[in-house]
Amino acid sequence: MSLIQEFKAFAARGNVIDMAVGIIIGAAFGKIVSSFVGDVIMPPIGLILGGVDFSDLAVTLKAAEGATPAVVIAYGKFIQTIIDFLIISFAIFMGLKAINTLKKKQEEAAAPAGPTKDQELLSEIRDLLKSQQGK
């Protein structure tokens, strides 16, 4: 099998395609959450804390000189990134919790209520054979 054929077989598998779709949706979801945090959550928090813009919070280690930009530790952006992470993690947790709940309900519904007709018939045959051996 050639390398191209092997790659086609690999790429055609359903789980690879599902993974690609998940990555694309995850990237889009990450952008939505980043916008939500930066544009919706952080401005009111900054207002409550006295008009602070978190994206501008930084410690300057070395001031800008000519064309050389300043060396800063942008801890405000880091705080926003942490909040992004917490929201995304919580959303993933809630999604997985919902999926696990659905799976559990399906497993409970799929559990057989009792022996099937085949099992009952086999039990009767077994009992008859035992009674014939005992005579």
Curated annotation (Swiss-Prot):
Membrane topology, as annotated: Multi-pass membrane protein
InterPro entries reported in the protein's UniProt record: Mechanosensitive_channel_CS, MS_channel, MSC/AndL, MscL_channel
Keyword set includes Repeat: no
Any Pfam family: MscL
Positions of transmembrane segments: 9-29, 79-99
GO cellular component: plasma membrane
Oligomeric and partner information: Homopentamer.
Record NCBIfam families: mscL, PRK00567.1-4
Family under the similarity heading: Belongs to the MscL family.
Protein name: Large-conductance mechanosensitive channel
Lineage: Bacteria, Pseudomonadati, Pseudomonadota, Gammaproteobacteria, Aeromonadales
